[in-house]
A protein has these predicted regions:
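Short alpha-helical segments that sit at the start of domains
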Residues: 2-29
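Short acidic, hydrophobic short linear motifs in intrinsically disordered regions
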Residues: 34-46
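Short amphipathic alpha-helical interaction segments
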Residues: 52-63
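Glycine-centered, phosphate/nucleic-acid-interacting loop/turn motifs that mediate DNA/RNA or nucleotide
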Residues: 68
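Short, Lys/Arg-rich nucleic-acid/phosphate-binding segment
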Residues: 74-80
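Amphipathic alpha-helical dimerization/coiled-coil segments
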Residues: 96-138
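Mid-protein regulatory/catalytic core that forms ligand/cofactor-binding pockets
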Residues: 120-215
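C-terminal regulatory/effector modules of DNA-binding transcriptional regulators
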Residues: 180-316
């Protein structure tokens, strides 16, 4: 059996794979910059080689549609699923974290949010959304972030309907005497030890693939390249979306997130041309072929090294 196939099968079987999560990864990575729509049969064809049947796909699509993440249209007996406005908005928000090439720059300022008069349920929901955006809880009603823009946070608060119940402050970096205490507080409030462990697990899972891609280069078919890319982004996404993406100045020494990101970039650059061609071959929309990726697709990870000639060689 091919070494790459063995790796792919091991990655699929290592942990339980949620259908809704995997297909969310597929839409975000392969379809969101190509119109966001695809025929159900095409999705089944893309995932068949990973051992996921049509029932798996149908169940996941049904749930994503029910959650308002996907829209569905039917032409005859065919069903086409596309990203809804909600799905596209959440996808764009996520990809700003997933495809970063480096830690965010920092001007030394902190954004502080103090919540007032919110019931426990609403407060818990707002805190969950803010934590996803990189905030940490300094106190039960006080959230802080060193890297969020006020305009983005205000949009989130308005969407949640709590803008009138949250007071926003801006603060400068603490004085030099406070830095040791600050680092300790940051590590605790942002759960950096647990985040670092998740990155280490990702590295252990995908680092063996780097030499395999060199040793078994002739085994890298477009289908295998797509499967590798999907699994890579799926598992990386699960880790990086929990990362607050703190500035370099606030991270502990030997932060595994740097290694994990570079590992992901290196593998992604290697398999992307063939994976892109495979999606083009199998993908079908309600009006025919999938459109070519938009320009933002090629800006991922600081810029993808994909030439048109490299894509064409996999479609011949």
């Amino acid at each position: 059996m091919s070494k790459l196939v063995t790796f792919i099968q091991h990655a699929v079987n290592a942990v339980p794979v949620s259908g809704t999560s995997l297909i969310s990864s597929l839409y975000g990575d392969s379809l969101s910059h190509r119109g966001g729509e695809i025929w159900l049969g095409s999705l089944a064809a893309l995932l068949e080689g990973l051992g996921f049947g049509e029932r798996f796909v149908r169940t996941a699509l049904f749930r994503l549609n029910k959650e308002g993440w996907l829209d569905v249209s039917r032409i005859g007996r065919r069903s086409f699923y596309s990203l809804s406005d909600k799905g596209l908005r959440l996808t764009r928000r996520a990809e700003s974290k997933i495809y970063r090439a480096e830690q965010p720059a920092w001007d030394g300022k902190w954004l502080l949010l103090l919540s007032e008069s919110l019931d426990k349920s609403t407060l818990a929901d707002v805190k969950k959304q803010l934590i996803w955006q990189g905030f940490g809880a300094l106190a039960p009603s006080l959230m802080a972030s060193p890297s969020q823009k006020l305009a983005d946070v205000q949009t989130l608060l308005h969407e949640a309907g709590v803008a009138d119940n949250v007071i926003c402050f801006e603060a400068q970096i603490p004085l030099a005497l406070s830095r040791a205490a600050l680092r300790a507080r940051v590590e605790e409030c942002w759960h950096l030890t647990e985040q670092n462990a998740m990155y280490e697990t990702f590295i252990q899972s995908f680092r063996p693939l780097v030499p395999l891609l060199k040793e078994a280069a002739d085994e890298l078919t477009p289908e295998r390249a797509f499967h590798i890319q999907l699994l890579l982004i799926h598992f990386y996404r699960r880790v990086v979306l929990k990362d607050p993406l703190l500035p370099e100045e606030l991270l502990p020494a030997h932060w595994a997130g740097h290694t994990a990101r570079q590992l992901c970039i290196n593998i992604y650059q290697r398999v992307a041309p063939a994976a892109l061609a495979f999606v083009s071959e199998k993908g079908e929309t309600s009006v025919g072929e999938l459109p070519a990726p938009g320009s933002l697709y090629f800006q991922r990870f600081g810029g993808l090294n994909i030439e048109q000639e490299a894509i064409c060689q996999f479609t011949r």
